[in-house]
From Swiss-Prot:
This is tRNA dimethylallyltransferase. ATP binds at G31, P32, T33, A34, T35, G36, K37, S38. InterPro entries: Dimethylallyltransferase, IPT, P-loop_NTPase. One of its GO terms (molecular function) is ATP binding. The keyword NAD does not apply.
Length: 340
């Protein structure tokens, strides 16, 4: 038997995890697309023995796999992933539904003395938990939505800018799903969604880690990943989804899927498809960074650092030790420099 390993397989030279003694809290790994969040969260979950919860608004849906960069079946076999791949694509899964499901799972983990890990790039999903936003529990309104869908997308977004400029500033102009949802809330409640989101912060400690890199490097990562996704069969995935659900499915109007749909309809030449997806994904990443930079307490790490897993581990163990000794969190690290 390896003398450096305990009976449960843990490396005895590694500092013991403080998870058994620290006050249970929540570790969040956030950041823009293509920064490797899922990989780092998986490594941390395996090391801590913690539940791993998804906070990506498109990865909750079944069958939307390649284009959402959903963890592969092989990755999910390594460690259980929760709040992922469980919603029918025809159902509009609301932030309120996510918040309720995530809060329930976090509470269950805390009862077991565990500190779960929340990972994703959907800022509103994450902030609904970390800030305890009061998300309007407005069920989908099919008749209202059908009426709103008769408007051209650019008119819907312009109208949202007039009715709720705060919400519009947090939604990409091409994100028709969230634009429709925001308008649905406004017309149902008579109040802007941003006004209704009153915060009730949770009473447990939270460590918020953000992965980033300068935009030129991030664009290279986006371009590389887009090429890999197309090579992995993304176009075939879109063809199958369009055949199964029809081209008007709201999820098929989201980033990447909409561009491939336009290509399949002959509205985008093949040579322009990949550059267009890369460009729009870059724009989306910039909006994500704007959101995350505004989140208080976030600690930034370079997503391309060779020792990134160890950096994350040191931050987490120091934070958990602080909960045990003083009930306070470590000082917040400097924010990343603004991109050119």
């Amino acid at each position: 038997m390896d003398q450096n390993r305990s009976p449960n397989g843990r490396d005895c030279r590694e500092p013991p995890s403080p998870s058994s003694t620290a006050r249970p809290g929540l570790v969040v790994i956030a950041g823009p697309t293509a920064t490797g969040k899922s990989r780092q969260a998986l490594l941390l979950a395996q090391r801590l023995g913690s539940p791993l919860l998804n906070a990506d608004s498109r990865q909750v849906y079944r069958e939307f796999d390649i284009g959402t960069a959903k963890p592969t079946p092989a990755e999910r076999a390594l460690w259980p992933h929760e709040l992922i791949d469980f919603v029918d694509p025809r159902h509009t899964y609301t932030v309120a539904e996510f918040q309720q499901a995530a809060q329930a799972r976090i509470a269950a983990a805390h009862r077991q003395g565990q500190t779960p890990i929340l990972v994703g790039g959907t800022g509103l999903y994450i902030q609904s938990i970390t800030a305890g936003l009061g998300i309007p529990a407005v069920p989908p309104q099919p008749q209202l939505r059908a009426q709103l869908e008769t408007w051209p997308p650019e008119i819907r977004y312009a109208w949202l800018q007039q009715l709720d400029p705060v919400a519009a500033g947090q939604i990409h102009p091409h994100d028709e799903v969230r634009t429709l949802r925001a308008l649905e809330i406004i017309y149902t409640t008579g109040k802007p969604a941003s006004y209704l989101r009153q915060a009730h912060p949770p009473d447990y400690p939270i460590l918020l880690l953000g992965l980033h890199c300068p935009m030129p490097r991030l664009e290279q990562r986006i371009a590389r990943r887009t090429a890999e996704m197309l090579a992995a069969g993304w176009i075939e995935e879109v063809k199958t989804l369009r055949q199964r659900y029809g081209p008007d499915l709201p999820l098929l109007q989201t980033l990447g899927y909409a561009e491939i749909g336009a290509y399949l309809e002959g509205r985008i030449p093949a040579a322009e498809l990949q550059p267009l997806i890369v460009r729009r994904t870059r724009q989306f990443a910039k909006r994500q960074m704007t959101w995350f930079r505004a989140m208080p307490g976030i600690q930034w790490l370079d997503c391309e650092a060779e020792d990134l897993p160890e950096q994350i581990w040191k931050r987490v163990t120091a934070w958990m030790a602080a909960q045990t000794s003083a009930g306070t969190t470590p000082a917040v690290a400097a924010r990343p420099p603004a991109d050119p």
